[in-house]
Amino acid sequence: MSKVQEILEAVKSLTVLELAELVKAFEEEFGVSAAAPVAVAAAPAAGAAAAAPAQEEKTEFDVILVSPGAQKVNVIKVVREITGLGLKESKDLVDGAPKPVKEKVSKADAEAIKAKLEEVGATVEIK
């Protein structure tokens, strides 16, 4: 197998977060920006190729508590843990659903917060 094929296989096995780190490392190492070439390459492409740059551009997400579900007390506890709010503020947030629990967080953080809240029975959206 040639070096190029080996590198291609290694890149295929990376997660999305690892690929983002790789792109950032390339940008820093070689003093280039991946934004312009991606936009130029995506312009003539159709469908899926055009959707990829749109996903890459969104780096901040809001976690919205839609409904606390049946285990409201447990949801309040998790909201306190996630936000650092006091008991009253957390209860007000949960009672006022739908409301944002956390805003402008990374996708990984948003997914982790969503998982914690869903684990205790809440309904959550990521926007």
Swiss-Prot record:
CC per GO annotation: cytosolic large ribosomal subunit
Any one GO molecular function term: mRNA binding
GO BP, sorted A to Z: translation
SUPFAM superfamilies xrefs: ClpS-like, Ribosomal protein L7/12, oligomerisation (N-terminal) domain
UniProt function note: Forms part of the ribosomal stalk which helps the ribosome interact with GTP-bound translation factors. Is thus essential for accurate translation.
Alphabetized HAMAP family for the sequence: Ribosomal_bL12
Assembly, per entry: Homodimer. Part of the ribosomal stalk of the 50S ribosomal subunit. Forms a multimeric L10(L12)X complex, where L10 forms an elongated spine to which 2 to 4 L12 dimers bind in a sequential fashion. Binds GTP-bound translation factors.
Name listed for the protein in its UniProt record: Large ribosomal subunit protein bL12
Organism whose genome encodes this protein: Carboxydothermus hydrogenoformans (strain ATCC BAA-161 / DSM 6008 / Z-2901)
The organism's taxonomic lineage, starting at the top: Bacteria, Bacillati, Bacillota, Clostridia, Thermoanaerobacterales
